[in-house]
């Protein structure tokens, strides 16, 4: 019995020593090279590489790895790695040269990660490579020049990185390359000619200059995007002549000049494909090209000949002066007095018609727009005593402050299209009533209205006239550098929020411009967007009318929350918002912003005092499109975003055009503030908020220490949902715009989180 047990133990030990080396040897060269890549990864938050280790018999079962039977049966090289696909796995690290030493690697997809550094020179050494997708990372530096080895390459995606230098000419000479995307980098220099096999070629949003190459692309090209570069000069007539007629070509926002060639593929484009080129002309643009004059003197005409005689046709019949009667031709002519009378009558008739048309136009214009009217519409005098020194032509009326405005943070309820500074009129400044310099009164005591002043509604639903609005009770809600906001309560109890815009703050010089912008904003309708109802136009001031939202703004809530946390008692905030209510606010904000971005719009100035709360605590986004109604100079100093605002992304100071990822960043800051009652700062709080531990227990403990004490008990019951929200906020405030999710993705994630609560 003992002998049998000894033999069994020996067999087990022998098996261990024999089996383990054999197993290690079974990991072929491809697996070793992949492990070298794994060890270059600094962070793997989703643990996607957890099953990559030496103990496996083959790398073919590893996450993201695909193998194909290419070698001899029953040998370590029977299955070879042909594909490595790990997109959007939040991997941080560098791309090692050994990765491209895998001899049969055909597909490499590491897009939408956090890889940095430069591409190794060996990137194009894998002769079997057919697809390289490294887009949406943080790779930088120049591209390797030697690309002759990858003759089988069909797809190259390096978009949304930080590559510099020139695009190697060898890339454009690859015969099998059909899809190329190098957009959103900082490539410079000339656009290389070639890309004959390309079907999709996207070089947009770079710094490419020089002229358009004549032999770019070929008969297979279906999509060409060279927009947002610095390409200059005229478009060659030979450019795009090989393109199919249904190809999409985008040359917008360059420095192109001259006429657009008449090739069919260019004529079939929309005008937007050529916009942003100030000196470009011809179809499909509506800008006509100037034609140089080629007129010259008619032949055989003497310089002394009268022009009238010069163009008179010569008679071919001979004239006999003896048989011609002197007055024969004179009888067929009109008398000079008759000609003069006809001419005068024509001039008088045309003048009368012109005056009639002008009169009708002016009458219609006055009926539609109160251009010449000057009305003093709720000119607020916020000074307590100085307001009583008004002119005799006006009557002072005192109105009580809106009860809803008596909040901890003062008059911070805000209106659509309105930006309110955090320094709005406070309760101590108001003393329960505010002096309003009302309309000029008539002898009968009624409010005086100019006959030419009209109110224009833009939503197609509201029935409101200026008489009714003039009789409304007015409550001051707040003041900004561009005007005053008040709550107007009609006789039937309906309330509107009205913003008064001073003429010097208004960007529109004419009523039609103002109406066009207001109607464009009013067309955006969503449950989480405030509704614009109408406007008034006057020489001295303009009014913007919208729905009144009764529950204040997030600014009021945050201010009250911070006051409560700094106080020893909880009296400052008797009914704090629960975690479920805050999650509801975040979801509503995401829905509204996603709708805005889907309509190709950007809010660009999301912050707590632009998020209103209705009676059900649903968020209502305001301030959309106000930048189009305000002058840039005033807007940038009063209501626009400032470089010191924590709700603006880091790239705000260097970007000229708002981007949807601005809204994502602002949303992330507010989401973190909803969870922690602290304002995230990319300069000071990045370590505190985003440097999470590898240990799940330590990570959860760190999060619970950051959470707002008012909802800590709620979070304990919904810890997974709260942690998911916290991680989502961290992703939104990434310093790299391409790393932030889209608003549509945020809505999808928040909808799933809400199911857990």
Curated annotation (Swiss-Prot):
Q: What is its main location?
A: membrane
The signal peptide annotation in the UniProt record is: 1-26
Instruction: Quote one Gene Ontology molecular function term.
Output: ATP binding
**Membrane topology term:** Single-pass membrane protein
Biological process (GO) annotations?
Answer: cellular response to water deprivation; positive regulation of abscisic acid-activated signaling pathway; positive regulation of seed germination
Please give the family membership noted in the entry.
Answer: Belongs to the protein kinase superfamily.
- Secreted listed as a keyword: no
Sorted alphabetically, which keywords does the UniProt record give?
A: Leucine-rich repeat, Membrane, Phosphoprotein, Repeat, Signal, Transmembrane, Transmembrane helix
Q: LRR repeats located where?
A: 104-126, 128-150, 152-174, 176-198, 199-219, 220-242, 245-267
Looking up Pfam families in the UniProt record yields: LRR_1, LRRNT_2, Pkinase
Which species is this UniProt entry from?
Arabidopsis thaliana (Mouse-ear cress)
Q: Which GO terms describe its cellular component?
A: plasma membrane
The record's comment about this protein's domains reads: The protein kinase domain is predicted to be catalytically inactive.
* Compositional bias ranges of the Polar residues kind: 638-654
Please give the residue positions where the record annotates the modification Phosphothreonine: 494, 638-639
Which InterPro entries does this entry report, sorted A to Z? Kinase-like_dom_sf (IPR011009), Leu-rich_rpt (IPR001611), LRR_dom_sf (IPR032675), LRR_N_plant-typ (IPR013210), PRK1-6/SRF4-like (IPR046959), Prot_kinase_dom (IPR000719)
What protein name does the entry list? Receptor protein kinase-like protein At4g34220
